[in-house]
Amino acid sequence: GEPPRSFHWQWRDKDDVFHRDGALTPREFFDKYVAYPLDDLVCLIHCPMDGRAFNRLYTIGHLGNVAEGDIVRYLNVDLATFKQAAADMIVKRSEPVWFGCDVGQRFNRDLGVLDLDVYDYALTYGVTHTAGKGERLSYAHSMMTHAMVFTGVDIDAEGAPTKWRVENS
């Protein structure tokens, strides 16, 4: 639907004290409570598809979430750069990092496990998956299906990220 022209915002703080503010326009809310320098950030993707060069800007059709909003541009980077940028945001800026991923194929909800080897397709079906990420993206066998946030990272002695703490919705 159409976004509200103004709204009242109410919340309880960490001490369970009730607060209310408004009427606020969306812009007033952003300026008062968010005031984040969004123009200082860039959206990164790791898309190793044929014909999608690294260090170039791309858009993704049907991925915008604001009618008549700005086109979102993504900088396609290699995986090492992607991981290092996310780690730097967490370690150097104390900022969580939003990310989108494909959880539909390798997720076992009952176990709460997201792992590339959660299912043994070779044992069950007698086949193995040999397509790489780029091929899976090219054939729409893989796509962003879920969003989560990196909230922590372990760094090895060389400064490289080794494992991530993920906050799921």
Name every feature range the model reports, one short phrase each.
Residues G1-S169:
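Long non-globular sequence segments
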